[in-house]
Design a protein with these regions (language model features):
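Sec-dependent N-terminal signal peptides of Gram-positive bacterial secreted proteins and lipoproteins
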Residues: 2-22, 319-336
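Non-catalytic propeptide/linker segments at domain boundaries
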Residues: 44, 55-116, 121-124
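Membrane-proximal low-complexity regions enriched in glycine and acidic/polar residues
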Residues: 176-182, 186-266, 274
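Active-site-adjacent mobile loop/cap segments within catalytic or ligand-binding domains
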Residues: 249-306
């Protein structure tokens, strides 16, 4: 009897554990969300649960009220316009949830990145939607890293893999996230690509250039859910202002996506597997600008771009400073000696003093030696 009870208890715990991880974007299953009138709202590569929320591109909020798992369809109630991002409210939310190490107050801009689904790739660019090695998602990671670094941000990118792509992937990537958080970054990004088949849902134009939309995902089953949501809303609001059409939408799902680890943690999906990978890579430049603005302010981009120019100009600035000082010295010497001959001696003496005898004195000594010969 005791053995049976123990086996039953273990089986129940395993089932609950599996269910908890399955909440987080089950792969290879598409769910369709419709409103109460039957109009299509969105498609998700993963399960949708009652209570999940969705913020559309035009900031309309939907709350799921029922789900038919056999038909892979969810019905959502329109709730009107999602309240606009409120900076004061966000500050209060982050103040109560922030776990960032106060010791990291050195002014350094630092963002940490990783990819939970290490196989995600793009059929148009990688030749397959899933690759065990050299997955296309890491090309997107590297492109975003480079774009952020050009803005003056230090990026810690983990290339750890968390295969296979199953319900336990987030458990494996959690270890990576925890290691990255030891660095006390300003934000923690989990980079993905979507799995919906219609690439047109991600095709867009920004500033007249073709690029990919980006979907933001927030896990509502975690203590940081409010902070994660505000972070996502801030990203969308900033992107809508700077690059209208870049952010596809925000999905707030039942899982946690490891976001309980950090208030400024977000999952970003760059395009889908049927989209041209180059478009997903192009979107990283826009997202880097958005993230830099969100985390460090409007002037951060200009500062980042100006740093290289300042460094490049430093050498020429020093040269001109020396030249001006030298010219002033020559004018003064000429005025005080009255002759060009004496001026030469004056300059040689000054050069000897400035260079510790390497110039000027050495020439005079050589001339003296020749005279003695």
């Amino acid at each position: 009897m005791k053995i049976r009870l123990t086996v039953a208890l273990v089986a129940l715990l395993c089932a609950l554990s599996l269910s908890a991880r399955a909440d987080e974007l089950d792969g290879d299953v598409l769910y369709r969300m419709v409103d109460v009138s039957g109009q299509a709202v969105m498609t998700l590569d993963g399960r949708i649960y009652e209570g999940d929320e969705y913020i559309s591109a035009d900031n309309q909020l939907y709350v799921v009220i029922s789900v038919d798992d056999s038909a892979h369809q969810a019905v959502a109630m329109p709730m009107g316009t999602e309240p606009a991002y409120d900076a004061d409210k966000a500050r209060a939310v982050f103040a109560s949830a922030d776990k960032k190490d106060d010791a990291k107050d050195d002014g350094k801009k630092l963002i940490a990145m990783y990819s939970t689904h290490s196989d995600e790739s793009y059929e148009n660019g990688d030749g397959a939607a899933s690759l065990a090695k050299n997955a296309g998602i890491y090309d997107v990671d590297r492109a975003l890293k480079k774009a952020l670094e050009e803005k003056g941000v230090t990026v810690e990118l983990s290339t750890n893999t968390h295969l296979p792509h199953d319900t336990k992937a987030y458990s494996r990537s959690r270890r990576t996230a925890e290691e990255l958080l030891k660095l006390a970054p300003d934000a923690l990004l989990d980079i993905h690509r979507d799995g919906i088949p219609d690439e047109s849902e991600y095709e867009t134009e920004v500033d007249g250039e073709e690029t990919s939309k980006v979907r933001l995902l927030v896990g509502r089953s975690n203590p940081n859910a409010d902070a994660n949501r505000e972070f996502a809303k801030q990203i969308k609001a900033t992107a809508d202002e700077k690059y209208k059409g870049l952010i596809k939408d925000i999905f707030i799902g039942k899982g946690n996506y490891n976001q309980e680890l950090y208030p400024r943690s977000i999952l970003l999906e760059f395009g889908t597997h049927t989209l041209d990978k180059d478009l997903a890579i192009d979107a990283t430049g826009y997202m880097a600008d958005v993230l830099t603005t969100v985390l460090y302010g409007d002037s951060a981009s200009a500062e980042g771009e100006g740093a290289a120019k300042s460094a490049k100009g430093a050498g020429s600035g020093i040269f001109w400073a020396i030249f001006i000082v030298a010219l002033a010295g020559i004018v003064y010497a000429l005025a005080s000696t009255g002759t060009l001959k004496n001026l030469g001696a004056k300059i040689a003496g000054g050069a000897s003093e400035l260079t510790g005898g390497l110039i000027g004195k050495r020439n005079r000594d050589e001339a003296s030696e020749k005279k003695d010969e």
